[in-house]
């Protein structure tokens, strides 16, 4: 079987409509290059100074930038602008406002001031706030994020912004993400500068590359399923005769209509200046992946949000529907969003790059030790920040990392860190090359890839695989940055007194690594994380196994994690409580919605399908006695009765849930009762579907869906 993957690397040699893509790359993005060209140089320098040194822009500078941005936007067909932000819901929001205004003489004029660029005022009353805001407290503010590029989609200029309440409470995910990067940078450079005397680091950037998985289904088939239309997941559906058993979809031939879809997506991404690196078929039928090149973490999150919007929009243009739910179809793999995490200094040093001699690479050893400690110490926080209720259907299903947080270093690095722990001499592998067929020898990677680990070292970065495909990467990276900062701060306190004595510093480096391994190496696993043996071993080691998102939230409630956010001002106690309540509300809303959809489908689709089958069988049985047909009739009849009972029970559970006021108790009730009942109901419905003839199945089956792209 041919293995195909479209890789663009940095050279865009695809022809679309006769134009070489590199000529159009970034034409819809008001990036640093365009700003430098459009602004008077002194104004550009003021913007750059404000960006680098976190200063406020004066009104004159803001007005000049706004004027240049407006002229550029108008020349590219924009008629409106919007402050674009990411509220606590995790879904981007905006309000379109027109450039056109009216002069004192009543004549039309295009206006856009520095004040309108820097600050906006959307209604904040209807966004999730976890109780921080009352409905009548409507005022909220958006503030321009100078670090991100503005861009044009359609006829709208989008300006990335931070969203806050009237009282200054954080109502979004961008602000805390930027703040968490700053505190990590502040602690990280102090450690780097202890060892790199010749190159002074004044800043560190968190660089993230996100790999987005998704499903594509035919639009007409999608429209015939209420569950797909409402929640993006099939809540009933028997397995297809052929699923992913043959592994013929993974990296296989991309269907022609999907190739056209990819082509359209690429064109939009390139115009926005987003580097689409790779695209390919994933494991499950109808499942695909796109990867975007590494960017500063806040820009990477923006790029991913834009990618998701473009994938959905472009799919519809191609008579397809793009699904981001982590588990839209049972019995085949679900989708994730792999978060590749690295930290780089202002002069390009990647602290997770082991180099040729990792044992003597002090910076590498310390930063990896910090990540080991952070991963183990904040397991529950990482589990929550990488997940959602919808991700529960994927985690731990022998297709994605289990719900247990573990770390894979690879055999070479694990041996290095264990040798330091045991205080034995580390012997580097002599032959670190690989010879391919008819090729020169090439360096061998320092680690294999463990797809079963929640966190895996992959050469010069750590890949966090738990992140759900529908979720923004903001929460996970905020948690990572803060947890890393916490560890790095303690490490620096140990090292700082000996900053002028490298011999003592070196001894302390090994001592710190040993201490971290003594306390936290339980989180390291080099085997099969899917296996029952690992689950039993993880339990013996005391690792958390939160099987559901709600279970992880419960554990988080009992674990004092807030200090890593509070002491550096990332969140206030009020904001942490609010975020926690928003997460609990998500549990309630998700399962309640699924329950309502299940009741509707039972009444309108599933039970009628069973009754239609009985109607067809009844005259045959009246005419001829057939023991097998009679048994089939009885099975379907009993299943219909059971499904009707399930429907009544779900209705009663929903009614009881609606009377619970406390959000924690409500989430617990919904998780323990409604979610459990929905799983049991599905089992009956799926078993009944297997007994129904094709002509009586009114819902598109898995077989129909999986063959809809060819």
Which role does the model predict for each range below?
Residues 137-324, 333-336, 343-583:
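Glycine-rich, acidic/polar active-site loops that bind/position phosphate-bearing ligands
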Residues 16-19, 131, 138-140:
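Gram-negative host-targeted secretion-system effectors, predominantly Type III and Type IV
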Residues 78, 82-86, 301-317, 343, ...:
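Hydrophobic/aromatic-rich, well-ordered segments within soluble, folded domains that form packed cores
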Residues 1-9, 14:
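N-terminal amphipathic/hydrophobic targeting modules at extreme N-termini
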Residues 516-710:
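C-terminal amphipathic alpha-helical interaction region
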Residues 90-106, 125, 225, 232-234, ...:
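Short linear, low-complexity motifs centered on an aromatic residue
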Residues 61-65, 85-87, 115-116, 163, ...:
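Active-site-proximal loop/turn and secondary-structure-junction residues that shape catalytic pockets
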